[in-house]
Amino acid sequence: MSDAAFDSVSVNPPANGAGSGDDFSVPVPRPKTSIFKLVGEVLDHGGPGYLQFAITNICNADCGFCGFARSQFDPKKRRSVTLQEAKDVIDIAVRNHIGYLLFVGGEPLVHRDLRAMVRYAARKGIKPMICTNGGLWTEENMKALASDGLSSVIMSIDAHDIAAHEKNRGLKDVCAKIRRANEFFLSLGVQTTASITASKLIEDYDKLPAFLESLGFENCTFSYPLTDLKSSYLSFSEGGLVSFTKDELYEVFEKIKRMKHRSGYPVVNPTESLDEMQRHLRGETEQFGCLGGFKYFYLDWHLNLYRCHFWETPMCNVYEWDESKLVRDGCTRCMIDCYRDPSVLQFVAVSVMDTWKALKQGQFLRAARHVFDRRNLTSIKAVAEDFKWVTKV
């Protein structure tokens, strides 16, 4: 499918909101959470959860390390959720204490109802976020989504120069679109983040900060390379770009840490999480079990809910999702950054919840164990490290 064909189905609903029951001319404010509400959420359920919602498996890009690539994906398997399904998901997510909803794909901007989904989430008090390759940005859809309550944008970056990035993505002039998107969203206070796949396309990590700044990014996060996923999610590849030996991958994490500390450029991945992934590679005991299935979730275009991208079997269909389905078993099977990194950051909030519940049950020794767990300090340090980014999401 050509870029022109994708443009025809990108975010462009009728101006009057026909067919969605919404008036798109009326702006929706970005959701905000008061400190008092946040404290209550932490005590009650460990703080707001996070849902990655793959609203489509269609993508306009042709990345060399992704199963969603347009040249690899079977057109007969294309599937997108309906607007009504998305609204149902958002209602269910609210009941399950989700505070952040990240729309992913495929490429979420190909979905014609993305605006309506973002608006509905924002009205329900969930912070809507978009993860995109940036190839379908237009002045029209940027302005539209900003007025729909969009909270944050994540855009993919693969290399430290334009030619290498655009060649891998198969998207001509995408860097110019990304630069313009950063300029536009930052002018409105909508946070943008570069999501960098740690692949062999990156020849020199020290060149990344200047390149990111040239595109208008003020921070970045690294996606750890994935060569196999057990769920329906296809953002992985067995190919050479993301295929590393354990020793090579260990050194990749060293390079990320060195870049982070030498340059001072804001890297969202907590240092402790990078250390944790190195412990994982060495087969050492890991300090922070993953909160996937308890605070973080992946939902696919079939509405099957997984604890993360890696897991083989769904927890349940989204319509069956309730507290009884939650899993908290300290899993350390994988190295997926969007579950492992926040598990370090949110550890202290979940510890506060555990302490509070133990106190209410009169279990004072158990409460004390949670309070004096050394990992609380490590988690607090990670939050302090990412404080500016966390408060803007």
Please give the residue ranges for each predicted region.
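Conserved alpha-helical substructure of the radical SAM core
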Residues: S2-S152, K357
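Conserved residues at the C-terminal ends of beta-strands
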Residues: A69, V104, S156, S223, ...
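Residue-level signal for well-ordered alpha-helical positions
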Residues: A69, N168, S223, W311, ...
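Radical SAM enzyme [4Fe-4S]-AdoMet core and its adjacent flexible, acidic
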Residues: M1-N16, V26, S147-S152, S156-L291, ...
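Radical SAM enzyme core and accessory elements
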Residues: M1-H45, N304, T313-C316, S324-V393
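Accessory C-terminal segments flanking Radical SAM cores
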Residues: D3, P48-Q52, E218, D228, ...
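Generic structural signal for helix capping and beta-alpha/helix-loop junctions
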Residues: F73, V110, T138, I162, ...
